[in-house]
């Protein structure tokens, strides 16, 4: 009897140690509104990291680039080539800053979830995590992409842009409209689901076993996080290119 109670007690303690809080939020009360503090705090940190790196990268630029300048130029060329491939040679240039901002913010946000020890900072409710670990952030990233999609099409084609909704036949009008207005959903839910699952897969083993064992999972998480940033940026650019080409 004592052995059974001892085993149950150990199992309970193990479950408490390995627990990961999901869906618990810490709010700031500002006026009559509740502001999701966790997302704002981590987003500000990510933005500060990006601004700091940008300032460091643009200091002392030289005609013959150093290794650090070469690295930054490689990133910029990668974003430029990605945008050009998806949007096209003639129209891609104005969209490079938008696609680059999306890619870099998501990339750093995703990696922050794997590399920064967010959970050592205690909050009254919930835990700090990567900004993209929250559906509010991923939706906030997907909505501007949807707006950019419609803006690009209207800017290029004017009111004739709406004619694509009755192609190839007017019967498809409701389906074509629904397709366009639901584009933010797969973007936001794919990013949110993958980053949340990645953090949970890494967090539980780390809480159960020594640090060395989950290291392969952490590297896998870094790879997955980078791929998710690339997928989001590629799809955003592809949507914009599609709206200007006027075909599905």
From Swiss-Prot:
The keyword Kinase does not apply. The keyword Cell membrane does not apply. One of its GO terms (cellular component) is chloroplast thylakoid membrane. Its main location: plastid. It is found in: Plastid, Chloroplast thylakoid membrane. It is a multi-pass membrane protein. Keywords: ATP synthesis, CF(0), Chloroplast, Hydrogen ion transport, Ion transport, Membrane, Plastid, Thylakoid, Transmembrane, Transmembrane helix, Transport. GO terms for molecular function: proton-transporting ATP synthase activity, rotational mechanism. CDD domains: ATP-synt_Fo_a_6 (cd00310). It holds the Pfam family ATP-synt_A. The chain crosses the membrane at residues 37-57, 96-116, 134-154, 200-220, 221-241. InterPro entries: ATP_syn_F0_a_bact/chloroplast, ATP_synth_F0_asu, F0_ATP_A_sf. Key component of the proton channel; it plays a direct role in the translocation of protons across the membrane. PANTHER family: ATP SYNTHASE SUBUNIT A, CHLOROPLASTIC. F-type ATPases have 2 components, CF(1) - the catalytic core - and CF(0) - the membrane proton channel. CF(1) has five subunits: alpha(3), beta(3), gamma(1), delta(1), epsilon(1). CF(0) has four main subunits: a, b, b' and c. Belongs to the ATPase A chain family. This is ATP synthase subunit a, chloroplastic. It comes from Anthoceros angustus.
